Every structure is written in structure tokens, then in C-alpha cells.
Amino acid sequence: MARPTGKKFDKRRQQQNPLFKRKKFCRFTAAGVEQIDYKDTETLKDFIGENGKITPARLTGTKAHYQRQLDTAIKRARFLALLPYTDQHKA
């Protein structure tokens, strides 16, 4: 049997799924940021997972241009001990 498709089915599925998340957007584009600063640790912490890994752009909605800057900024902050490498280190 064929699966139902179309807008009507999509709306019904979204209403039934309690885990449906709103559309992702790039926070840096919305804020008009040109460069991501490695010294802004509060912003960088939002993009680091619970175990210390950098969260991928497909989960955060960050554009590729800013994701590259974000990766570099997090790595610089880690090197300078502004951010921990893993969850076992205290920040």
C-alpha cells in the first residue's frame, strides 16, 4: 500500500509528533555577525555538546561559512584553556 503524501499528511504528522522542532536558522546570520570571536566563550559553549564535542551544523542550523569560523574559534579557545577539551575537565 502506498504511503500518503502531500501537505495535508505533513501537517497531520507534525501535529501528532510532540518532538517536532521548529525550523532551524543561523544565529550568526540573524545577528549580523561578521567574525566569531574565540574569546566569547558563552556563545561558543552553546555549540559544544555535553561530552565536549563540537555540535554539527545539521543540528544547529549554522551556515557553512560560520560553522568553519566556529570550529576554528572553539579550537583556539580550547588551546588557550578558555574552554575544556572534554566533559571531564572543569571550565
From Swiss-Prot:
Superkingdom, taxonomy of origin: Bacteria
Keywords: Ribonucleoprotein, Ribosomal protein, RNA-binding, rRNA-binding
Biological processes annotated in GO: translation
Signal peptide: none
Pfam families: Ribosomal_S18
PROSITE patterns: RIBOSOMAL_S18
Gene Ontology molecular functions: small ribosomal subunit rRNA binding; structural constituent of ribosome
GO CC term, one of those recorded: cytosolic small ribosomal subunit
Keyword check for rRNA-binding: yes
HAMAP family: Ribosomal_bS18
Subunit architecture: Part of the 30S ribosomal subunit. Forms a tight heterodimer with protein bS6.
Function: Binds as a heterodimer with protein bS6 to the central domain of the 16S rRNA, where it helps stabilize the platform of the 30S subunit.
Family named by the database record: Belongs to the bacterial ribosomal protein bS18 family.
Protein name: Small ribosomal subunit protein bS18
Organism: Burkholderia multivorans (strain ATCC 17616 / 249)
Phylogenetic placement of the source organism: Bacteria, Pseudomonadati, Pseudomonadota, Betaproteobacteria, Burkholderiales
Gene that produces this protein: rpsR
